[in-house]
Design a protein with these regions (language model features):
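Extreme N-terminal basic, low-complexity initiation segments
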Residues: 2-11
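N-terminal Sec-pathway targeting helices
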Residues: 15-37
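An N-terminal hydrophobic leader/cap segment in hydrolases
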Residues: 30-77
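Membrane-embedded segments
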Residues: 79, 83-156
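Conserved dinucleotide-binding and phosphotransfer motif residues
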Residues: 122, 160, 184
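Alpha/beta-hydrolase fold nucleophile elbow
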Residues: 161-172
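Glycine-rich nucleophile elbow surrounding the catalytic serine of serine-hydrolase chemistry
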Residues: 170-180
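A conserved short beta-strand
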Residues: 186-190
Length: 190
């Protein structure tokens, strides 16, 4: 009876060792697969970061079609050659402020038409910028590009009205740019 027990014990040890080697091999392969998946995910996020960060609606826009007939759609060219769409509603008189409107992510100026109608209802002016890549404007959005767009729009607006009449209105994505712009240029309010 003794030799059989020793043989069974050796067999059990060998089976356990084989199982352990197989388990370790599977774990190594899983770890390697996980590492490869993580690296691919990081690479994908790097390559697609603009698409994950910005959600532009590039559709062309007509202010009259969305209930803002007093707005003129204009085009402004940035120093880096991009064309931006601007909706311009002059103020009722020289005493009224003008809102430089920097919109948020995920839509275009058409989606804000009701808000614009409320802004201009009391005679204030509106200079609403459509970021690069949004609503008829060229290129694709980027942090540096948004700042170029805002500086360009501000520069054109202060050729039309005094800086002390400009109110910066930033919505969501545009609020960050508005704060950064207000740190650089004179405005009536933010």
């Amino acid at each position: 009876g003794g030799p059989k027990r020793g043989g069974c014990a050796v067999l059990r040890v060998r089976i356990a060792a084989l199982f352990l080697r197989c388990a370790m091999s599977v774990l190594r392969h899983l770890a390697l697969a996980g590492l490869v998946a993580y690296i691919l995910l990081c690479l994908m996020m790097f390559v697609l970061q603009r698409r994950l960060q910005y959600f532009p609606d590039p559709s062309p826009m007509d202010p009259a079609a969305v209930g803002l007939p007093q707005a003129r759609s204009e085009t402004l060219t940035t120093p880096d050659g991009e064309r931006l769409v601007i909706w311009w509603v002059p103020p009722r008189d020289a005493s009224r402020p003008v809102y430089l409107y920097l919109h948020g992510n995920g839509a275009n100026l058409q989606a804000r038409a009701e808000r614009f109608a409320r802004i201009v209802a009391d005679g204030a002016g509106l200079y609403a910028l459509s970021w690069r890549g949004y609503g008829g404007s060229t290129s694709t959005p980027s942090e540096a590009g948004l700042m170029i767009d805002a500086r360009t729009a501000y520069g054109e607006l202060v050729r039309r009205v005094a800086a002390d009449r400009v109110l910066l209105y930033g919505e969501s994505l545009g609020s960050t740019v508005a704060v950064m712009l207000a740190a650089e240029v004179p405005v009536r309010a933010l």
